[in-house]
Amino acid sequence: QNFGGYAREAYVASKALVGKPNKQNSKFIMFGRGRSGSTLLTSMLNQSKLVNFDKEIYNRSVLFPRQFLKNRSAIYSGDVYGFKLLSYQLRNQFGVEDGKVFLNELVQDQGYKLIYMKRENLVKQTLSKHYARFRGSWHESKKVNRTKMIVSIQDFIHELNEGRKLDFLEEDVLVGIPNFEVIYERDLEENDAKIKLMLNICEFLEIPTFRPEIKLEKISSKQVADYIDNWSELEQAIGKTKFSNFLADIE
């Protein structure tokens, strides 16, 4: 995977070298974690003719991450350039301390705006990740027939602990950095909330407002037992951990 990242880095550098660099009027980072609604928000933002939203550019290691970002933004057209950065990618590519410096450089020195994606219920977020991995599909554009899965309780508890570590990391690296916070449960579960969110984000990014078409469907049911075959056993196991407080919001 590292070789693929280095090859992509070299390709982007060559394109930036021979092409005329594009200068955007606005730039932003979408920062957070998987299963926080970032793909849904990306699909809505990309419906603006002004926005050119790049992907997770650090999902593979690169040798010169700061220059890589400059090259990526240089080859993208459009008035607004954005890219997605997951917190584990920041940790893996930069380390925590340099990750803080990197985010500060982007926001304070280079004029990037930061959209912070988060989810209040860590258990629901982890369930969603497990089910997406099981189905081999992270997002759907139409309704689907759902099949059930059996979750490894030990693996699930381990992922909850890893998720808590990322909670602390995100809190740490964002200290002192202005950001627009998007909470999945508040802003992305209902269509009316999504429309309101888009109006506020357009204002934050200083672009004309628009009404997006909602194209993606949730792949998991609201009833956990509909897609987790051993939910009763998993629920009991979670209830004996420090994550038991998240169970109150789960149907």
How would you name each of these model-derived features?
Residues 1-87, 220-223:
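PAPS-dependent sulfotransferase catalytic core
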Residues 14-15, 66, 93, 100, ...:
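Intrinsically disordered, low-complexity regions
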Residues 20-24, 30, 105, 149, ...:
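Generic signal for short, ordered secondary-structure residues
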Residues 53, 122, 212-215:
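Glycine-rich, flexible loop/turn motifs
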Residues 61-63, 148, 173-245:
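The conserved 3'-phosphoadenosine-5'-phosphosulfate
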Residues 87-179, 187-188, 192-210:
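PAPS-dependent sulfotransferase catalytic domain
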Residues 246-251:
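A cross-taxonomic marker for long C-terminal extensions/tails that follow the last structured domain
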